[in-house]
Amino acid sequence: SRSSAASDVYKSHMIGIFGMFVILFKNIKLSLIGVVPNFIAAFFILGIIGLLGIPLDMMTITIAAITIGIAVDNSIHYIYRFKEEFNSSKDYNKTLILCHSTVGKAILNTSITIVFGFSILVLSKFIPTIYFGIFTGLAMLLAMVSVLTLLPSLILLIKPFNK
């Protein structure tokens, strides 16, 4: 069925992205931390679409893929910067403050630009395009919030870097 096929595709993407994180960061804990914010935004937005009874068509189903794709970039940038800065300071709290003032600002600015870019699609007269713009913009906003709040919180909680 279509639902089963879509589920298999998402499982494959999750495994692939997790594998990419493991190869990139060479750290299982850090990889698990890194994928959480990405999937939360995608699952949340698909949940809202389902609750509203909006059918999953080509426009709405690609929202999750786009969300994960962009959120993964944000997570990689944040984790990479955190790792680099932590190697110098060896202090999680100082590193968090530094990362939020540098890469955090960049993630915020690019994410807001992306949200506005997708939001312009609400001016369309084609309903699937309107849905795509609204929900992708909302998903990007949620992904940004997740990467800037949940990701650092998980890093502080789990402390995946060696002192």
Q: Where are the regions a protein language model picked out?
A:
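Hydrophobic transmembrane alpha-helices
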Residues: 18-21, 39, 55-79, 116-119, ...
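Interfacial segments of transmembrane alpha-helices in multi-pass membrane proteins
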Residues: 11-57, 123-127
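Alpha-helical transmembrane segments of polytopic integral membrane proteins
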Residues: 25, 45, 72-79, 109, ...
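Pore- and gate-forming transmembrane helices of large, multi-pass membrane proteins
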Residues: 70, 87-125, 144-147
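Loop-to-transmembrane-helix entry motif
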Residues: 7, 39, 99-110, 135, ...
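Single conserved hydrophobic/aromatic residue that forms the stacking wall/gate
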Residues: 1-12
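Transmembrane alpha-helices and their membrane-interface boundaries in multi-pass membrane transporters
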Residues: 78, 131-163
